[in-house]
Amino acid sequence: MLQQLLITLPTEASTWVKLHHPENAKEGAPLWEDVTKMFEGGALLSQDADETQGESLKDELTPGTPTTDSQELLTFKDISVDFTQEEWGQLAPAHRNLYREVMLENYGNLVSVAGCQLSKPSVISQLEKGEEPWMTEKEGPGDPNSDLKSKTETSASNAKYNILQEQLYHGMMMERFMRDDVIYSTLKKVSEYDDELEKHQDRHGRNVRQTIMTHKKRSQETYKFGKNIVSSNVVIEQRLRKCDTPRKRNKCKSDVINHPTSYIRVKTYECNICEKAFKQPIHLTEHMRIHTGEKPFRCKECGRAFSQSASLTTHQRIHTGEKPFECEECGKAFRHRSSLNQHHRTHTGEKPYICDKCQKAFSQNISLIQHLRTHSGEKPFTCNECGKTFRQIRHLSEHIRIHTGEKPYACTACCKTFSHRAYLTHHQRIHTGERPYKCKECGKAFRQRIHLSNHKTVHTGVKAYECNRCGKAYRHDSSFKKHQRHHTGEKPYECNECGKAFSYNSSLTRHHEIHRRNVFQNNI
């Protein structure tokens, strides 16, 4: 069925459909509708398909040979780009090699589509011999005997046919980009395609220009660059359409070439271990250090090593105290931009991370992850000394200080040290007199939240801690633990002088008074 559809088309339109690679009639039918709408009016779709099939393709593709309808068929000139000696000298070596490769491939594609041997242009001969393919100022691009006069006098149907020529050129170039996935080839094609449109505007005027731009937009939506290039030309053309004057247009074209990542999203560098792809080779190099474990960036202050230079820069702010990211709302400063972004949510009240089990919302993703462990019971962080497990790594770090005796938090008022930052915060309220937790019932204030919770039981009369041995109940957890020592016989408080042990800390304190009195009496 697909072959029958192709037979009913003229050779040029059939070639256009084949470039879209339909695998069956079902996929080919929409293309048939497109090409019918595109060329309805008699420009290309002959009323008699057999007559179109019988024409000699070789004669049609010979430059300078007019057709019966004054329609110009696709020649190598239409898909080639010429440079003067000055322009050629401004091209970088990589761009020259790319130009040589694309031009040779375009000529090969044209010969393949035509199905016959075309006369070889001089520029192709120069490229094959390795010569520089620039032309003199007196020469015009392409064949000097081209049908320029007939182009300027073309009708609306000729304009539609020129659209097909551009579509065919676009399709042949598209095959190269989908196969190679090279960003510079894409940019080169966009630049050449845009130059062709500017020439077309000069030949046919603004009304035909609008027709071509409308058709080109539909063409861009039809073609897909694959997973790595997503609608890049549509973005570029929308940007270029806003440039009305030649000066603005040249600036826009320069922006496209100089800043390709603003317009085209391409991932061309792939990790051969995990197959993750990156836009730039430096990002791939940094990623490979995850697999190799290499950490070439070392802090001179503490000797800590990092795999990325940016990580070292961020770490050094710990030593310098630099906090370059400041909140405009409250003036609080942060070392990391991500910390500032998280802090902003305290002002906006935004909590985008929601637990799907209890619908509790959190402002940070890490808070949600930690919360989920309360549902799963997971405690992934284990102490190597005693085997105790924790849900959060900071809780493990604080616990390890019990074994090491480390107390890194010191009070600036009395130099007392603490193993936890929270303990230091509570202690500093002794010096400042701050009591932020206030009872709503009686107005009494407390330094710690736990003290307020214990106090509330006085008003409620609740004694939540009940001994399962004797049934005695207590309001406070600390009182309940002391009572249990009556049953267990535990005496955790031991005198350093005589080794006597006690169940309560207060009993040990009173016992110490005995030793102090004895020492005082002996000195007398």
From Swiss-Prot:
Q: Name one GO biological process term.
A: regulation of transcription by RNA polymerase II
Its Gene Ontology cellular component terms are:
nucleus
Outline the extent of the SCAN box domain.
Answer: 1-39
| Comp. bias (Basic and acidic residues) | 131-152
- Give any GO molecular function from the UniProt entry: zinc ion binding
Coiled-coil segments: none
Q: Which UniProt keywords apply?
A: DNA-binding, Lipid metabolism, Metal-binding, Nucleus, Repeat, Transcription, Transcription regulation, Zinc, Zinc-finger
Q: Where is this region: Disordered?
A: 49-69, 131-155
List the Pfam families: KRAB, zf-C2H2
Every copy of the KRAB domain together lies at 74-146
User: Which residues belong to zinc fingers classed as C2H2-type?
Assistant: 269-291, 297-319, 325-347, 353-375, 381-403, 409-431, 437-459, 465-487, 493-515
Q: Which SUPFAM superfamilies match?
A: beta-beta-alpha zinc fingers (SSF57667), KRAB domain (Kruppel-associated box) (SSF109640), Retrovirus capsid dimerization domain-like (SSF47353)
- What InterPro entries does its record include? KRAB, KRAB_dom_sf, SCAN_dom, Znf_C2H2_sf, Znf_C2H2_type
The record's subcellular locations are: Nucleus
Return the PANTHER family for the record.
ZFP14 ZINC FINGER PROTEIN-RELATED, ZINC FINGER AND BTB DOMAIN-CONTAINING
Q: What does this chain do?
A: Putative transcription factor that appears to regulate lipid metabolism.
Q: Its family?
A: Belongs to the krueppel C2H2-type zinc-finger protein family.
Q: What is this protein called?
A: Zinc finger protein 69 homolog
